[in-house]
Amino acid sequence: MSDKGIFRTSSTPSIVDVTPDRGERPRKLVRSVLESPSQKDVASIVKIEQTPSRPFFNDFLKKRITDSLNERPNLLNKFMSAQDGTPSKSTGFNERSSQLVSEFTTTEDIENCEETTQVLPPRLVVYELRLTNFKSYAGTQIVGPFHPSFSSIVGPNGSGKSNVIDALLFVFGFRASKLRQSKASALIHKSATHPSLDSCDVEITFKEVNSDFTYVDGSELTVRRTAYKNNTSKYFVNGVESSFSAVSNLLKEKGIDLNHKRFLILQGEVESIAQMKPRAISEGDDGLLEYLEDIIGTSKYKPIIEENMQELSNSDDICAEKESRLKLVLSEKAKLEDSKNSVLSFLKDENELFMKQNQLYRTILYETRNKKTLVQNLLNSLEGKLQAHLEKFEQTERDISEKNEEVKSLREKAAKVKNDCTSEKKTRQSYEQQTVKIEEQLKFLLNKEKKLKKSIEALSFEKSEAENSLSSHDIDSQKLNSEIADLSLRLQQEELSLDDIRKSLQGKTEGISNAIEEKQKAMAPALEKINQLTSEKQILQVELDMLLNKENDLINDVESSQSSLDKLRNDAEENRNILSSKLKVLSDLKGEKKDVSKNIERKKETVHNTYRNLMSNRTKLEEMKASLSSSRSRGNVLESLQRLHESDNLNGFFGRLGDLATIDEAYDVAISTACPALNHIVVDNIETGQKCVAFLRSNNLGRASFIILKELAQKNLARIQTPENVPRLFDLLRFNDQKFAPAFYNVLQNTLVAKNLEQANRIAYGKTRWRVVTLSGQLIDKSGTMTGGGTRVKKGGMSSAITSDVSPASVETCDKQVQLEDTRYRQHLSELESLNQRFTEISERIPSAELEISKLQLDVSACDRLVAGEERRILQLKSDLKSIRNNNERKRNLQNKISNMDKEVEAININNEGLVTEIKTLQDKIMEIGGIRYRIQKSKVDDLHEQLKFVKDKLNKMSFKKKKNEQRSQSFQVELSNLTSEYDTTTESIATLKTELQSLNKYVDEHKSRLREFENALWDINSSIDELVKFIEFESKQMNSVKAERIELENQIQEQRTALSEVGNNENKYLKLMSNLKLHNLTEFCDQTTMDSTFPEYSEDELSSVDKSELVSNISVLKKKTEDREVDINVLSEYRRCNKEAEKRDSDYQSELQKRTDLKKVVTDLQSQRLDEFMYGFGIISMKLKEMYQIITMGGNAELELVDSLDPFSEGVLFSVMPPKKSWKNISNLSGGEKTLSSLALVFALHNYKPTPLYVMDEIDAALDFKNVSIVANYIKERTKNAQFIVISLRSNMFELSSRLVGIYKTANMTKSVTINNKEILTD
C-alpha cells in the first residue's frame, strides 16, 4: 500500500497515498485555541500562530493519556476512595456494592484482563463495501478498502456519507424504516440517468487480520443482500444464497453480534447509551441493567431462572395436593382392619385342607410313578431293539441316498460332459466349416494368382516388344535421319552440279527453263495440295487401322469368355444339384434327430414311471409280507380266544376293540393314529380277562391287552362344544352296541379331528389345550408334543380291512405284478439305450453332413462369383464392342475421307496432267539440248529426290508406329501395374489365408483331442452310474426285509406305549389335581415365620409310610369345617389396595418434596451464579468506566452504581457522572457534549471488558469541542488496536488521525468514493 501519486476513485479499488514524501514540505494549520481544565497543562500549545504540524498536538495528548495511566497506583483503591483528589460521592456504591466489588474485582484481575487483551488473535474486519444501485450510489461503487484499525469517512453534507452506514445496516438485517426509507424498494437508486432500476445490492467483504495488520490468507468472507422492486430481499454468503439467521450466526461466531448491535453507534444515538434507564420498564425494552447483562453474559440465566421459579411454584402446589390425598387413604385403610382378620382365619383353615390333599395326591403319584417305571423299562428295551433296526434301516437309507446323490451328481456330471462334447463338436464343426471356407477361398485365390501371373507374363512380353520396337525405332530413326542428311547433302551437291550444267546451257535452254518454271509455278499449289492430302490420309489410315484391330480383338475376347462362362455355369449347376441332395439328407437327419429326442424324453419318462411303480410295488410287497406276518401273529391270539368263546368256555368276551364300531373311511387314518388301543381285547370283567391271560399263557399264543368294561369310570358322553366346531373323534363312531361307548371314550377322551396341521395348531395351542389329530395322521397331544405324519401313516385300525386284504393270494398277486413291472422296466431301459445309440449316431452324422454342405455351398458361391465375374466381363466386352460398332460412323467417315482424298488427288493429277505433260516435254527438250551429261546429272538429282522422299516417307511411318507403340506401352504399363497390384494383394491374401488355415487346423486338432477326452470321461461316468444303480437295487431289497422286522417291533412298542399312556393319564390326573391346589398367600398379613406359603416336599420313605385312610378322614373333617362359613374374600384385596395406595401416595409425596428441594437448590445456585458473574463483570466495567472517563475528560469521574445493593436485578444500575471541576450529576442534567463523552467512556470500558472486532460510528463527535474530539480520536487511535473503527466525521481533529480516509462526493446526483492512506507529514 505504498503507491504514490496515483489517484483512486470508486472504480479503482487500490489504496493510494496522494501526499508527497513526509520530508518534502511543511504543513500549515489554522489558528486554534485548545481549552482545557488546566491552562498549565496546555500552555505550550495555546495561541500557536504557526504550528509545525498537527502531530505535535497529538503527541501531547498521547503523553497526557499515558501519564494518566501510569500515575494510577491501584485502580481498585482509586475506585473505592477517590485518591485522585476528586470528592467521593456519598450516593455512589454503598456498603453492599463495595463489598461485592472488593470480593469479585481485584487489581490483578483487571491487569490480567488487560494482559489478555494484548494477545491479539486474528479478528474479522470489514475490508471493503461493494454498493450497486444503492440509494445515492449509481452502478457499482466500491467503498474502501478500510483500514484494519481506524478509518474515517469524510465528505460534504448530502454527499452520501450516512448511506455508507445505511449500506452496512442493510446487510446487517435492518428494515428499510431504520435506513430512513419507507420500504425496501425505496433503497434502489433513482436519478435522471437511472430512472428505473430493478434491484440494488450491497456486498461486504470481510477478512481476518493479524495483530501486525497483515491479512490472513484464504480468510475472505463476502456477505451480500439484494433488494428488489417488489420489496423482497435475499442474502448471499460467498455467492451462495442464504438467510439472515445463517448470516447472523456466521458473524456471531466471528465476534460480530447482529442481535445486540453494540458495534453500531448511529447519528444521534451516542448520547442515548448513557441515558438508558436503570432497568427495562417493560418486556422488550432495554435498560442499563439489560445492556450490561448482555455484555457480561448473565442474561442467559434470566429465562432459566424464571422457568425454574415457575416450576418451583408448581411444585409447592403439587406437594400440598399429594399430602391431602395421603391422609385420606390412611383413614380408609384403618376402617378395614376387623373384616380383614375374619377373612384371614377362614383362609388359614383352607390352607390346612390343601396341605392334607396335597400329601394324599403325592402318595398316589408316588405309587403311579413306580408302576410307570416298570412299563418304561420294558418299553426302553423294545425301543432299543427298534432303534438298532432303525439305525440299520437309516444307515441303509443313507447309503442308498448317498449313492443316489452320487448317481445324481454323476448324471449331472455326465450331462455336463455331454454338453461339453456337444459344445466341442459344435466348436470343431465351426472351425472345420471355417477351414473349408478358407480352403475354397484359397483355391479360388490360387487360380486367380495363376491367371494373373500368366496375364502379367503376356503383358510383360507385349510391353517388352513395344519397348524393343521403340528402342529400335530410335536407332532406325537416327539412321534414317543420318541417311536423309547424307541424301540432302548429296542432293544439294548434285543440284549444284545440275545448276552448273544448266547455267552452261542457259543460252540454249533459257526460254525452255523459263517456260518450265512458269508451268511449275502454275502447278505448285496443286503439288502442295497433293502433299497435304497425302499426309492427312496417312494419319487417317493409322486411326482406321487401330479401330479395325480393336474390334477384331473384342470379338475374339467375347467368344473366349462365353466359352468359359458356359463351363462355369455347368459346374455351378452340378454343385447345386449335389448341394440340394445333401441338404435333403441333412434335413431328414435333423428331423429324425428331433423325433428320436422326443422319443427319448418320452421313453425316459416311461422308464422313470416304470421304475417308480416297480419300487413302489416292491415296497408294498414287503409291507404286505410284514403285515401278513403281523396279522397272522395277532390273528392267532384273537382267533384262539374267539374259538374259546364259541365253545362257551369264555363268557363276557366281546373281541377286538376296533371291530366293535365303524367310522367313515375319511377318518380311517385319524382314528388309527389317535387310538393305538384299537387292537386291545374287550371283556366284561376282571375274571374274564384273567381267563384270557391264563389261556394265552398256557398255550404260548403270545400277549394281548384287555379293556374291562365294569372297571371303566362312568363319564358324560354327551356332545361338547368344540373350537371352530371341529368334530370330536368319539362322536364320529358308530357302535355295534352302546355298551361299548365307555371303552372307546376311555381310549379317545375328547380327541378332536382337524382338517390340516394349521387348524390343528390353532386349536391345540389355544387358551384351552386339546388333543388334536389331523386327517393325514398328525397328532398333537395336550402336552404339546407332535407325532405321526410322514410318508408311512397308520390306517385300517377301526376295521380289519387291510388285514383281511393282505392274504397270501394278494401277496402272490403283488409278487407277480412286481416281476411284470421289472420285465417292463428292463424292456423300456433297453429301448431307451437303442434310442440313445441312434441319437448319438445321428448327432455324429449331422456335423459331417453340415461340413460337406458347407464345402458345397462355398463351391457354389465361388462358381456364382466366377459366373458373375465372367458375365460382367462379357457385358463389358459387348458394351465395348457395341460402343466400337456404334462408332462405325467414324470408321465410315475415315474411309470416306481417305477415298475423297484419293479422288481429290486423282482429280488434281487429272487437272494438271497437261501441265505435267508439257513440263515433261520441255524437260525432255532440255535433256536433248543438254545431252548425255545433263541427262545423267538430272537422273542423279531425280534419283536422289526419290530416295530422299522414300526415306522421309519411311521416317514418317516409323514416327506413326513409334507413337502407336508409345500408346501401347503406356496402356500395357497401366494394365501391368494394376495386374501386379492385384497379384500382390492376392499373394498377401493367400499368405494370410494359409496362416489362418494352419491356425484353424491346429484348433481343429486340439478340439478333436479334447472331444476324445470328454468321450472317454463320459464312458467312465456311465460305467460308474451302472455300478451304483446295481448297488442301490441290492440295498433296496435288503431294506425291505428290515422293514418287516421293524413292523413287528413297532407293534410290541405300541402295546407298551398304550399301557404307559394309561399310567401317564392317571399321573396327569393327579398332577392336575395338585396343580389346582393353591395355598393362600397370607405372608403380607401374618407373620412369615408361622405361615407356610408353599407345599412341603416329601421323601420316598415318607410317602411309602403314609396312611391314606387317615388322610382321607382328616380331609373330610376340614371340608365340613370350611363349607359352612361365608366370608367376603374381597375385603383382603380392598385392604391390599388401600395399603398399596397409601404406600404409593407416600412415595409420590416424598418424591415431590425432594423435587421441590432440588428445584430450590437449582434456583439458588442459578441466582448466585448470575449474581457472582454479574458483579465480577460489573466491577471490572466500573473500574474501566472510571478510568476511561478520567482519560477522556482529563480529571472527571464516572460511576456505575446499584440502585438496590442487595439485589442488583430488582432496580437496575445508575450511571452517574462528575464532569471536571463540577459536582456529581445525573446523566439527564449534562450537556450534549458531556453526554457524548459519558457514553463513549462507557463504550470504551465495555470494549475493554469484552472487545468487539468492529465499531461503526456516525458523527459521534458532533456535540464535542475541539479538545474532546482530539482526545476521543487519540484514544481510538492509540488504545483500540484490537478493533476496527469506521467513523463518519466532519471534524479534522478526528479524521486526520485515522489511518485511512474514505472520501465521499457526489456528481450528477450520483455518489462516488475515493480512498487514500492518511500519512503524517514531518516538517523541516
UniProtKB/Swiss-Prot annotation:
The modification Phosphothreonine is found at residue 19. Its main location: nucleus. InterPro entries: P-loop_NTPase, RecF/RecN/SMC_N, SMC, SMC_hinge, SMC_hinge_sf. ATP binds at residues 155-162. GO terms for cellular component: chromatin; condensin complex; cytoplasm; cytosol; nucleus. The keyword Ribonucleoprotein does not apply. Residues 310-337, 370-628, 825-1077, 1297-1324 form a coiled coil. It is found in: Nucleus; Cytoplasm; Chromosome. Transmembrane segments: none annotated. GO terms for molecular function: ATP binding; ATP hydrolysis activity; DNA translocase activity. SMART domains: SMC_hinge. GO terms for biological process: cell division; mitotic chromosome condensation. The keyword Nucleus applies. Residues 1-24 are annotated as: Disordered. Residues 651-764 form the SMC hinge domain. Phosphorylated by CDC2 on Thr-19 at metaphase. Belongs to the SMC family. SMC4 subfamily. Central component of the condensin complex, a complex required for conversion of interphase chromatin into mitotic-like condense chromosomes. The condensin complex probably introduces positive supercoils into relaxed DNA in the presence of type I topoisomerases and converts nicked DNA into positive knotted forms in the presence of type II topoisomerases. The flexible SMC hinge domain, which separates the large intramolecular coiled coil regions, allows the heterodimerization with cut14, forming a V-shaped heterodimer. Forms a heterodimer with cut14/smc2. Component of the condensin complex, which contains the smc2 and smc4 heterodimer, and three non smc subunits that probably regulate the complex: cnd1, cnd2 and cnd3. Interacts with C1739.07. This is Structural maintenance of chromosomes protein 4. It comes from Schizosaccharomyces pombe (strain 972 / ATCC 24843) (Fission yeast).
